[in-house]
Amino acid sequence: MSSTLSSHNVIALKASNLHLQLGGKTLLDNVDLEIRSGQITALLGPNGAGKSSLLKVLNGEITPNSGSIEIFSSPKDHWPSELLAKHMGILPQHSTLSFSFLAHEVAELGAMPLAISNHQAQQLAAKNMVKVGVDHLANRLYPTLSGGEKQRVHFARVLTQLSHSGEQCILMLDEPTSALDLAHQHHTLEIAQALSQQGAAVIIVIHDLNLAAQYADRLIILNQGKIQADGTPWQVLTPTAVENVYGWPVQVIAHPEHNYPVILA
């Protein structure tokens, strides 16, 4: 994607009055939010708070009962699916794939919306596998990979998909660190951070408050389908706010070198 400053601080995604009810349970209760380019926005909250439901509504996987979504100032319904695929990439928490593709073939699937040659797709996917750190797995059968390895291969696929997004880029990550070890958690979030610094709008569903505080520019805490807090890490992660939402007392201190909040439970 392009790294021009004009893509920063643009409203990439706007949601108005989103309401979602499934099986008689309200999952989203009239949610309003704007997601801006050039930022990482982390969606936080306890289990069942509505985080993944919100992400799935924003990316079109689930249709809300009511409400509207705009992507770069145009109604989402006005975006042809093949065009939207070039500008919005989604890494789900769990990716099911029943065919015995090689890992590099999975990464190359990201090039399908790009209308490029097979050779170009292979080069692009190989580049992103190196970036994610899975190039050594390129010729492994995908089903033989560990959960974390599969997740990283799919991240390479999503990066390949967004490689021609230009200034309009939205990256959605649903629990991207859940199956990863410490080093790969930070490496994944560093890649997301670099994309946001180039102008991408990055939305991450994450449970780890400390990782969110370290990497996100903006935190949104959801609870019972409603936004309970929205702001910078220091504005949102107060002891009172965290205890009220999660039901557990915490202390909040400043990181000794980088001054982001650190949660001690």
Swiss-Prot record:
Protein name stated in the entry: Hemin import ATP-binding protein HmuV
Keyword terms of this UniProt record: ATP-binding, Cell inner membrane, Cell membrane, Membrane, Nucleotide-binding, Translocase, Transport
Family membership: Belongs to the ABC transporter superfamily. Heme (hemin) importer (TC 3.A.1.14.5) family.
PANTHER family listed in its UniProt record: HEMIN IMPORT ATP-BINDING PROTEIN HMUV (PTHR42794:SF1)
Major enzyme class: translocase
Gene Ontology CC: one annotated term: plasma membrane
Organismal lineage: Bacteria, Pseudomonadati, Pseudomonadota, Gammaproteobacteria, Vibrionales
Subunit architecture: The complex is composed of two ATP-binding proteins (HmuV), two transmembrane proteins (HmuU) and a solute-binding protein (HmuT).
Binding site for ATP: 45-52
